[in-house]
């Protein structure tokens, strides 16, 4: 089977889930200048064609720096924010205006060069962001540097209803006609909050948030962000992480940080279960719970490959339906990714741990240990004092977790009578 067929099958639930959702996408000026920009635009057009309501916010910092250099002007910053005097504002307006036109042209060109040629794509922009001056902070006058005061929610929603891609630039206007230079991260965050967006997608140079060892942090709650912000200091990753957390605190369900340098990073994040960047969300990513009858299909999908390999004893749908109350599961985004069952053994104070399975894509996240702890806790609550497990392939895993080798003679009579000598499973036990 071609790989793309398998990918499409796995992506189809996300295609359906994302339709008619509102995504705010923030692309910094560095991302627009990157060689991968064309691929990002193509992916945005693809999202639009799949029914996603798109608001694209672009940055312009390197483009402004270039204009300043051309005019022999020195950029000035305080606390990471540009000080925008009159001469700098002229450069900002020039850079932002040219960049907005270039992005609109690229979006138009991309659809003409794609299989969607002939379909109509409209890009809409305008005075959709009202701003106010930052003013004087710590004795420093920021002049024409501003902050978002209000986003025209009704105006943007109407444009999205008309199937336009809304393009927001890092400029804001005051009721008195002044123009202010804004941070694109601020524009994107406020737009996502005020629109009640389903997602805020933030592009950065890295694959996502990297920890102190350079490893990707895949998931975070907003309340877990503070230590990372302290570690990152003024690093741009910190700005992205702060924006992602603020959006979630403001009601946006999920914020994502992905790489503008990696081809396909946006689609990987949106259409695969594991994603490719960093997800910040108030939602619980995974839940460990008791199984219900609705989980039978997911359990079969999880354990069938292991049954075919002889690792697990075969269980029919009917058996699972009858024994579903014995199972605990780990659910992630509607998918059962791990399970385990506890069977009390008749006429004894012992139980059997059975059918412990974890999806291969999630085997290094401690989910097996989490399920084992849950099964042991359930066993204690039931008054059991010994836990048996029969295994053919994972003996060392259980021994590392306190299970000792045992034998058929140690099994309670009700279980010993059912022992399959042909399968010849190794028997281990653990005192609770």
From Swiss-Prot:
<keyword id="KW-0055">Arginine biosynthesis</keyword>
<keyword id="KW-0963">Cytoplasm</keyword>
<dbReference type="GO" id="GO:0006526">
    <property type="term" value="P:L-arginine biosynthetic process"/>
</dbReference>
<feature type="domain" description="N-acetyltransferase">
    <location>
        <begin position="286"/>
        <end position="425"/>
    </location>
</feature>
<dbReference type="InterPro" id="IPR033719">
    <property type="entry name" value="NAGS_kin"/>
</dbReference>
<dbReference type="InterPro" id="IPR010167">
    <property type="entry name" value="NH2A_AcTrfase"/>
</dbReference>
<keyword id="KW-0808">Transferase</keyword>
<comment type="pathway">
    <text>Amino-acid biosynthesis; L-arginine biosynthesis; N(2)-acetyl-L-ornithine from L-glutamate: step 1/4.</text>
</comment>
<dbReference type="GO" id="GO:0005737">
    <property type="term" value="C:cytoplasm"/>
</dbReference>
<dbReference type="InterPro" id="IPR001048">
    <property type="entry name" value="Asp/Glu/Uridylate_kinase"/>
</dbReference>
<dbReference type="GO" id="GO:0004042">
    <property type="term" value="F:L-glutamate N-acetyltransferase activity"/>
</dbReference>
<dbReference type="InterPro" id="IPR016181">
    <property type="entry name" value="Acyl_CoA_acyltransferase"/>
</dbReference>
<dbReference type="InterPro" id="IPR036393">
    <property type="entry name" value="AceGlu_kinase-like_sf"/>
</dbReference>
<protein>
    <recommendedName>
        <fullName>Amino-acid acetyltransferase</fullName>
        <ecNumber>2.3.1.1</ecNumber>
    </recommendedName>
</protein>
<dbReference type="Pfam" id="PF00696">
    <property type="entry name" value="AA_kinase"/>
</dbReference>
<dbReference type="Pfam" id="PF00583">
    <property type="entry name" value="Acetyltransf_1"/>
</dbReference>
<dbReference type="InterPro" id="IPR000182">
    <property type="entry name" value="GNAT_dom"/>
</dbReference>
<keyword id="KW-0012">Acyltransferase</keyword>
<comment type="similarity">
    <text>Belongs to the acetyltransferase family. ArgA subfamily.</text>
</comment>
<keyword id="KW-0028">Amino-acid biosynthesis</keyword>
């Amino acid at each position: 089977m071609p790989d793309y067929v398998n990918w499409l099958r796995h992506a189809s639930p996300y295609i359906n889930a994302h339709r008619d959702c509102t995504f705010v996408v923030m692309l910094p000026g560095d991302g627009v200048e990157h060689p991968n920009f064309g691929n990002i635009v193509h992916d945005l057009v693809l999202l639009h064609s799949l029914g996603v309501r798109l608001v694209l916010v672009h940055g312009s910092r390197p483009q402004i720096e270039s204009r300043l250099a051309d005019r022999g002007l020195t950029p000035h910053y305080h606390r990471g924010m540009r000080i925008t005097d009159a001469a700098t504002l002229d450069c900002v307006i020039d850079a932002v205006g040219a960049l907005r036109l270039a992005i609109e042209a690229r979006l138009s060109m991309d659809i003409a060069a794609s299989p969607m040629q002939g379909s109509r794509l409209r890009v809409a922009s305008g005075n959709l962001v009202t701003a106010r001056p930052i003013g004087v902070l710590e004795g420093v006058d920021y002049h024409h540097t501003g902050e978002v005061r209000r986003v025209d929610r009704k105006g943007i929603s109407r444009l999205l209803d008309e199937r336009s891609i809304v393009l927001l630039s890092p400029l804001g206007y005051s009721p008195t006609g002044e123009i202010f230079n804004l941070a694109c991260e601020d524009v994107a965050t406020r737009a996502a909050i005020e629109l009640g967006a389903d997602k805020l997608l933030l592009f950065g140079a890295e694959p996502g948030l990297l920890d102190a060892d350079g490893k990707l942090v895949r998931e975070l709650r907003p309340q877990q962000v503070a230590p990372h912000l302290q570690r990152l200091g003024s690093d741009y990753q910190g700005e992205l992480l702060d924006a992602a957390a603020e959006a979630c605190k403001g009601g946006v369900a999920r914020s994502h940080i992905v790489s503008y340098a990696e081809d396909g990073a946006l689609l990987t994040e949106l259409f695969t279960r594991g994603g490719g960047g960093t997800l910040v969300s108030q939602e619980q990513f995974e839940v460990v719970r008791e199984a219900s009858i609705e989980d039978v299909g997911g359990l079969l999908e999880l354990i069938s490959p292991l049954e075919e390999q002889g690792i697990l004893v075969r269980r029919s749908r009917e058996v699972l339906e009858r024994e579903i109350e014995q199972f605990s599961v780990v659910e992630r985004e509607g998918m059962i990714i791990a399970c385990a069952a506890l069977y009390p053994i008749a006429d004894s104070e012992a139980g059997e741990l059975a059918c412990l399975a974890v999806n291969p894509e999630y085997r290094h996240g401690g989910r097996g240990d989490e399920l084992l702890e849950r099964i042991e806790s359930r066993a204690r609550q039931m008054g059991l004092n010994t836990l048996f497990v029969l295994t053919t392939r994972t003996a060392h895993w259980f021994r590392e977790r306190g299970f000792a080798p045992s034998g058929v003679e140690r099994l309670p009579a009700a279980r010993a009578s059912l022992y399959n000598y042909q399968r010849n499973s190794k028997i281990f036990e653990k005192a609770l």
